[in-house]
Amino acid sequence: MTETLFALTNDDAGGSAPELFEELLDFLDAQQVPVTFFVLPHGQGTPLDSKPEWMALLKRALKSGHELQLHAFDHSSTFEFGVPPDFMLDIIPDAKARWEREPEVVQQAHTLELMSDRIARGKAIFERALGYAPTGFRGPCLSMSANTYQALANHGFVWSSNEVVNPMGWRYINKDYDAGEPWQPNVPPHPYRYTAGIIEIPMVSEYTWYLTPEDMDRHYDLIRSDFDRVRAVGGTFLTLSHYYAMTGEWTTGLRVYERLFEYARSLGDVRFVTVSRLLDAYGVPD
C-alpha cells in the first residue's frame, strides 16, 4: 500500500457532557476528518435511546460520515470485560491495588456466560437506538479477556481495537516522560487475526488526555514521531482519544491534532478513514 491510513478513534460517546461531544463534532466538521466513535449503550445507568440529546448528536455524527461502534456496556468498572494492561492500571491506582490483592475474584467476573450477557445487552440497546448492528468493539480502560473475544465472535462481531502499539502515551499521562517504554514487540501497527478469529486493529497510543498549553510541544512530538515510524514500516495509524479530555478547557488536545492533520496532509499520501474503512482498505495480512 502506497498511502498511510489514519484513523482517529474516540471513546465514551453516550456518557456525560454531550455539549463537549458537540464541540468535537464542530472541530471535525471544520477539519473534514471522519472518526470512529465507540459508544456506551448504557452509560450512567440509562439506555442510549432514552437520551434524546445524545441521540441527536449521534445521528449528526453518522450524517457527517463518522462511524459508531460498541464500547463496553456501562463502563461502570475498570474490569468490566477483563483486566486492563499494566500501563493502564498504573494510572488507576485503586484498580491496580485491587488486581494485586484479589486477582481470582476479579477474574471470576469474566466467564464466557457473563461476557456474552453484557455484550448481548449492549448490542441490543445499540441496535434499538441506532438501527444497525455494531461490528467493532472496544473495552473500557482496554479491559479484555479471552472469553470477551469469544463472546464477541459468538455475537457476530468482526473486529476490535484494544491492543496498544506504544504505551508511552499512558506514561505521559502519569508525567513519566523518561519511562522509555518500547513499542510492544507482539503488537504490529496494522490489522491482524487475533483471539477467537476476531480481527484486532491496534491503536498506536493515546496522546491528548487533559493537556494544557505547556504540554503542546511534548505531546505533538510524541504523536508525530509515532506517525512517522508507522509510515516508515507501512503500517496503519490508529489513535485513541476521549472527547471530554480534548474539549472545553482542554482544547490543547484539538490543537495537537490540528497540527498533525496539517502535517499529514502536507505529505500528500495520507488518507483519513474510519476504522471499518481502514480494515476494508488494508485487509488482514496472512
Mark where each language-model region is.
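C-terminal domain-boundary segment and adjacent tail
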Residues: M1, V35-V39, D215-D286
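Active-site beta->alpha N-cap acidic-glycine motif
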Residues: M1-E67, S76-S77, R128, D269, ...
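Hydrophobic faces of well-ordered beta-strands that scaffold small-molecule active sites
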Residues: F6-N10, V35-F37, L68-H71, T135-F137, ...
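The substrate-binding groove and active-site-proximal loops of carbohydrate-active enzymes
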Residues: F6-S16, F38-L48, E104-L114, A133-T135, ...
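Short, solvent-exposed loop/turn segments at secondary-structure junctions
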Residues: A13-G15, P41-G45, D74-S76, C141-M144, ...
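Acidic (Asp/Glu)-rich catalytic clusters
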Residues: E22-V33, L48-F73, V83-P93, A153, ...
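CE4/NodB-like, metal-dependent polysaccharide N-deacetylase domain
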Residues: L28-P34, K96-S145, I201, R229-L240
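Active-site-adjacent pocket scaffolds in enzyme catalytic domains
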Residues: L48, S77-T78, G139-V233
